[in-house]
Amino acid sequence: MAVLDTDLDHILPSSVLPPFWAKLVVGSVAIVCFARSYDGDFVFDDSEAIVNNKDLQAETPLGDLWHHDFWGSRLSSNTSHKSYRPLTVLTFRINYYLSGGFHPVGFHVVNILLHSGISVLMVDVFSVLFGGLQYTSKGRRLHLAPRASLLAALLFAVHPVHTECVAGVVGRADLLCALFFLLSFLGYCKAFRESNKEGAHSSTFWVLLSIFLGAVAMLCKEQGITVLGLNAVFDILVIGKFNVLEIVQKVLHKDKSLENLGMLRNGGLLFRMTLLTSGGAGMLYVRWRIMGTGPPAFTEVDNPASFADSMLVRAVNYNYYYSLNAWLLLCPWWLCFDWSMGCIPLIKSISDWRVIALAALWFCLIGLICQALCSEDGHKRRILTLGLGFLVIPFLPASNLFFRVGFVVAERVLYLPSVGYCVLLTFGFGALSKHTKKKKLIAAVVLGILFINTLRCVLRSGEWRSEEQLFRSALSVCPLNAKVHYNIGKNLADKGNQTAAIRYYREAVRLNPKYVHAMNNLGNILKERNELQEAEELLSLAVQIQPDFAAAWMNLGIVQNSLKRFEAAEQSYRTAIKHRRKYPDCYYNLGRLYADLNRHVDALNAWRNATVLKPEHSLAWNNMIILLDNTGNLAQAEAVGREALELIPNDHSLMFSLANVLGKSQKYKESEALFLKAIKANPNAASYHGNLAVLYHRWGHLDLAKKHYEISLQLDPTASGTKENYGLLRRKLELMQKKAV
């Protein structure tokens, strides 16, 4: 087994704490770093993965989670992102149930506690990485390298690059994946207890358990499968003591003893490698079958380098992305929620100064790899090898080497690779301490890094508390990112600041002239401001760029309807439905078009389709009731109204519409009850009081009619119909008073 190099651990500028206290300190520090995010909102991707994800609600059968992607879409759909994380979604569903709805505090607290727990687990992981494996006679693993493991765990706990995973609720996928990844690694270590008397049987159990935990990690996030590769590296280079330098020397000298290398004759190692390979192959096969229609389809704006025609351009830019990821680990002050859409322009020429970053990255990596594989110091080899293994292997799924990914740089994918970074940094501090007498200076540097990173975590957690702060924080990092401007515009539009939203949407379109979502949203705002001509031009361009953009087709239809271009509007609605068959809002708007054209049957059919697809679509129900009421079909209007209220019992607008129908049918008592219920739900609706007054007027309850006419006119003094009815009532009351005299 690997043994501890006591010299390295003793000279590190770190305290020695018993395991319990070390874990308590690390866990507490991890909580302090990200506690500020506990009461934050759902931000950015949280909206799609949580708030709009029906898989979290009880109406969706639990079994559907195994057939849906992370965002709630069916995996078999061509539009699915194929991100299969059912166990993560299950935890969201439990959170939703325990919180009694979409209350973000519970979701954020779980994320913070998960990061704290993972940081605590890191103390054990780093103890193995730095100190090796040693067990007591009772089979308990010794806590070796206490200084190194504490320092590395603290560096991990306070790393600001983790903010996206902890403060963004969807980052739970990375947290859960990391948790089971580390448990799998520690479980694999259990297979090599020196006190193991049962030999292969016990070892096989722990190897199989490790593979199972790797599968669980993969069901939290795809990255989890890479733990099998890390376990294999650990087994070969640490347990098997495979020495590349020794092998190379024997090959060069044609040493016949090469044939007798223990690793090559180790049946146990070959058996474990077979298990790991078989387990990994099985997991990949199942994962591929689940994907259904093949890999996801990404666009050029998601990952521009992967669409470059030249293989050289692709390779250069991929390596530049790697250097940016390395820089985020080294200097995590430059953070952004999204790095796509022009944030990182492509390197297209060797004269681009950014190629220096590639050279620096590979200079460092090659140096570390040479030291890791060829150093005569076995302890140094082990630490560097495992540090590089943790740095590189979990990052492979995001590297674009095996398949195209849907992002340029993503801070969340660095959660596990940062373990390797912390190993290398801690080893570097140890090496510096060993070769210099300025121990206090190194200790001050270490404390400075911990303090600055903690401060950055607190500040960055604050930026993740709301979308406005998060999006605006990105402007200084990625001013060329069209998506940053788009998201700021969307946030402003949601708050009603249309003028500012238009400015940001226009900038997003300027930065990316093919940004159809920005065109669609800008077109919608212009439509609401009655700037119909420009709205039509933008929406027409959007559907020209992306012909299957159903939402843009529907919005184009709305604009064309407003311009009285009814045939074009109908065609646009039909095209939208063609590309998105289950589109209740489009059926609703199509029904409005038919109503404007007095095609009443077609309108009713369109609205009925909307309610079939979305039973809670109150606008469609309301329009059906009103149309049937206006055309004199009171019995049918009443039936539709009752059907609607059974599905949406607390919708006051439906109560109001049905109450009007019942009043015309002289069902005064039932109509009154519905009016009063609607008014209780929405007491400031002038029309509710006005129509209830009309009911009382017809019914002969003139004092009550007078009361509600007056309330209605207080709420809306400009309502001409109410004024006229109130005047009629007053004249009637005056006549009655004169007759009484």
Swiss-Prot record:
Q: Does the keyword Transferase apply?
A: yes
Please give the clinical condition linked to this protein.
Answer: Deafness, autosomal recessive, 122: A form of non-syndromic deafness characterized by adult-onset progressive, sensorineural hearing loss. Sensorineural hearing loss results from damage to the neural receptors of the inner ear, the nerve pathways to the brain, or the area of the brain that receives sound information.
* Catalytic reaction(s) noted: a di-trans,poly-cis-dolichyl beta-D-mannosyl phosphate + L-seryl-[protein] = 3-O-(alpha-D-mannosyl)-L-seryl-[protein] + a di-trans,poly-cis-dolichyl phosphate + H(+); a di-trans,poly-cis-dolichyl beta-D-mannosyl phosphate + L-threonyl-[protein] = 3-O-(alpha-D-mannosyl)-L-threonyl-[protein] + a di-trans,poly-cis-dolichyl phosphate + H(+)
**Gene encoding this polypeptide?**
TMTC4
Record topology, Extracellular segments: 36-111, 163-165, 220-224, 289-354, 404-412, 462-741
Pathway where this protein functions: Protein modification; protein glycosylation
Gene3D superfamilies given in the database record: Tetratricopeptide repeat domain
Q: What does this protein do?
A: Transfers mannosyl residues to the hydroxyl group of serine or threonine residues. The 4 members of the TMTC family are O-mannosyl-transferases dedicated primarily to the cadherin superfamily, each member seems to have a distinct role in decorating the cadherin domains with O-linked mannose glycans at specific regions. Also acts as O-mannosyl-transferase on other proteins such as PDIA3.
Question: What's one Pfam family here?
Answer: TPR_8
Q: Which molecular-function annotations from GO does this UniProt entry contain?
A: ATPase binding; dolichyl-phosphate-mannose-protein mannosyltransferase activity; mannosyltransferase activity
The organism's lineage is: Eukaryota, Metazoa, Chordata, Craniata, Vertebrata
Task: Give the main location.
Answer: membrane
Q: Name one GO biological process term.
A: positive regulation of endoplasmic reticulum calcium ion concentration
Q: Which family does it belong to?
A: Belongs to the TMTC family.
Q: Record's Gene Ontology CC terms? A: endoplasmic reticulum; membrane
Give me the segments passing through the membrane.
Answer: 15-35, 112-132, 142-162, 166-186, 199-219, 225-245, 269-288, 355-375, 383-403, 413-433, 441-461
Which cysteines form disulfides?
none
Membrane topology, as annotated: Multi-pass membrane protein
Could you list this entry's UniProt keywords, alphabetically sorted: Deafness, Endoplasmic reticulum, Glycoprotein, Membrane, Non-syndromic deafness, Repeat, TPR repeat, Transferase, Transmembrane, Transmembrane helix
Q: Where in the cell is it found?
A: Membrane; Endoplasmic reticulum
Residues the record marks as carrying a glycan:
78, 497, 609
Write the protein's name: Protein O-mannosyl-transferase TMTC4
Keyword Endoplasmic reticulum included in the entry's annotation:
yes
- Identify the stretches annotated as TPR repeats: 482-515, 516-549, 550-583, 584-617, 618-651, 652-685, 686-719
Q: State which Enzyme Commission number(s) the record gives.
A: 2.4.1.109
Please give the residue ranges for the topological domain Cytoplasmic.
1-14, 133-141, 187-198, 246-268, 376-382, 434-440
